[in-house]
């Protein structure tokens, strides 16, 4: 009979519904089961009549799933009430117990596994007998511990709900000298369990990082002939007016992020050293004026570039007369302002 029941359990496993989730590690579950309980090797003493060995069995269980391969379960089993009749005695036997087992499983897929449970059951067995000859009734009970072996298949219907088909065997439930029998029990059951903590945790979405400051670089070119007299580094009134117009655009500079660099350039007339010094003084004059208007002093700096980076190129190489050469090289005499940190600069001021 045991072989037949196990074969049925394996065959029915083929009809498992498609699962949606496998159990997670380190989670708890609880469930209940109902099935066919069959007693074996009953051998009631002084009974020569029929014994109803097939009964309804049920149980409840809870467990902890350590990982896909190992879990632990504790449960209560009602193994059923087995009546018997004989020419001498009529009576009944019932058994129940609390079991503790280790559950060893092997995943077939992410959602279906086979398993075995190994452990023990603390049971209580009760008998009630009526003597047909004397008319006397007698009640007895016994308690003890027996090994438990189980095997089955388990699959998930949803991430939280799982079903199992299981065959369980419990050996020697009772003392024949005390209650008149010592049967074994096989329980083929269908169970349903609820698994805690199976839902996917909502992902923690990090807030989008603040956009990086859009540091833009703007270039302004002011003609030195508008700002200064020839060969001088003192601002003319026209130059101050041009810088006033520029300041109206620079005033939106964020002092925490922005910076202004003023570059002074000269033409090639004169020595390198002289032109370097003149370019530095002119750049500093522009810086000083813009600071006086309100540009933070720690956000603006001056740099003299001398006669480097001429914009006229070779245009004036054939000009020999000094006045004409000075006029031809006028574009080289300039002040460039490089601004970082201003997003909206309208237009270049007219010099």
UniProtKB/Swiss-Prot annotation:
Domain OmpA-like residue range list: 215-343
Pfam families registered for this protein in UniProt: OmpA, OmpA_membrane
Main localization (coarse): membrane
Protein keywords: Cell outer membrane, Conjugation, Disulfide bond, Ion transport, Membrane, Porin, Repeat, Signal, Transmembrane, Transmembrane beta strand, Transport
Secretion signal span: 1-21
Membrane topology value: Multi-pass membrane protein
Task performed by this protein: With TolR probably plays a role in maintaining the position of the peptidoglycan cell wall in the periplasm. Acts as a porin with low permeability that allows slow penetration of small solutes; an internal gate slows down solute passage.
Sites annotated Part of salt bridge gating mechanism: 73, 164
CDD domains for this protein: OmpA_C-like (cd07185)
Recorded name of the encoding gene: ompA
Organism: Escherichia fergusonii (strain ATCC 35469 / DSM 13698 / CCUG 18766 / IAM 14443 / JCM 21226 / LMG 7866 / NBRC 102419 / NCTC 12128 / CDC 0568-73)
Keyword Coiled coil: no
InterPro entries: Bact_OuterMem_StrucFunc (IPR050330), OMP/PagP_b-brl (IPR011250), OMP_bac (IPR006664), OmpA (IPR002368), OmpA-like (IPR006665), OMPA-like_CS (IPR006690), OmpA-like_sf (IPR036737), OmpA-like_TM_dom (IPR000498)
Family of the protein in this entry: Belongs to the outer membrane OOP (TC 1.B.6) superfamily. OmpA family.
Domain of life: Bacteria
Protein's UniProt name: Outer membrane protein A
Quaternary structure annotation from Swiss-Prot or TrEMBL: Monomer and homodimer.
Residues in Sequence repeats: 206-207, 208-209, 210-211, 212-213
Gene3D superfamilies reported in the protein's UniProt record: 2.40.160.20, OmpA-like domain (3.30.1330.60)
Keyword Signal: yes
SUPFAM superfamilies in alphabetical order: OMPA-like, OmpA-like
Subcellular location: Cell outer membrane
